[in-house]
Amino acid sequence: MNKIIIGTRGSVLALWQAEYVKAELERAHEGLSVELKIVKTKGDKILDVPLAKVGGKGLFTKELEEMMLQGEIDLAVHSLKDVPVELIEGLTLSAITEREDVRDCFLSDKYASLETLPLGAKVGTTSLRRSMQIKSMRSDLDTESLRGNVQTRIKRLKEGDFDAIILATAGVNRLDLWKEVNYVIPIDTEMMIPAMGQAALGIECKEGSEAFRLTQILEDKKARIETTAEREFVRVLEGGCQVPIGANAYLEGETLHLKVAVGLPDGSEILMDRLSAPKGEAVRLGRELAARLIAKGARELLRRAEEMAFQ
């Protein structure tokens, strides 16, 4: 195979990610030609509705997966946090890349932190997970849906539509957005637990394909272990990408730690827990922590969270 086609979404961040994968593949495999094919997903087309109300799984991946199965593209580059925990039969995550900074990031032109926002300040976010944790800290804050690409979100912040917005620090780093507004402050994971898979790229392709073999050079063992625990936790809970679940695993030596949060989007109820295990037991760790939260009522909380999101 001397040519492969990568499917990618068309946002600046998605293209940065696809170009990174393209460069790594061409560097590692002499004579390989890599082409990018831009694909609009359902999540890209519906911008006037909060993601949770759009509903369904694979909002940013399904069209890319269908094109892979039809042979129109050889692989897709995803933000791993957007990839459903159950993949379509015949497809696999051939590589999970080294993680960028996993933290969420606070951006504002006027205020230096969530704590210093005035009463009733308006915070823009795409995520029920972020909204849940913001409201659990500051129930007075007004969290509102903020859709669109990163540049659109920052533009709306600068125009005064919001007092602050929350983005992923990984995206801020990749697009070098540190000087876009006055305050760009990563939020400690003890304060806001990230989404499963946050800051890693997931490379998806057909099982046993040549693309699978070629993309092995992108695999990061640490990221694979951490995100396996996170994704297994969400899978057992039967939560999708658009429900208020935080899951952050991190390796320290031979020990894998996992901390999680599940609750209602308004932050009025939230379950948090953490557990550790040997690094070779990522799946068990995710399952065990999910079972603990299910015993505390997590599935019922998520059912209520979905109802609230659709109101």
Curated annotation (Swiss-Prot):
Q: Which GO terms describe its cellular component?
A: cytoplasm
Q: Name one GO biological process term.
A: protoporphyrinogen IX biosynthetic process
Named in its record, the pathway it takes part in is: Porphyrin-containing compound metabolism; protoporphyrin-IX biosynthesis; coproporphyrinogen-III from 5-aminolevulinate: step 2/4
| Catalysis: reaction(s) | 4 porphobilinogen + H2O = hydroxymethylbilane + 4 NH4(+)
Give the sites modified to S-(dipyrrolylmethanemethyl)cysteine. Answer: 241
> What CDD domains does the entry give?
PBP2_EcHMBS_like
- Please list which residues make up the signal peptide: none
Required co-factors: dipyrromethane
InterPro entries for this protein: HemC, Porphobilin_deaminase_cofac_BS, Porphobilin_deaminase_N, Porphobilinogen_deaminase_C, Porphobilinogen_deaminase_C_sf
Leftover remarks: The porphobilinogen subunits are added to the dipyrromethane group.
What is the similarity comment for this entry? Belongs to the HMBS family.
Q: What interactions and quaternary structure are annotated? A: Monomer.
What is the name attached to this protein's record? Porphobilinogen deaminase
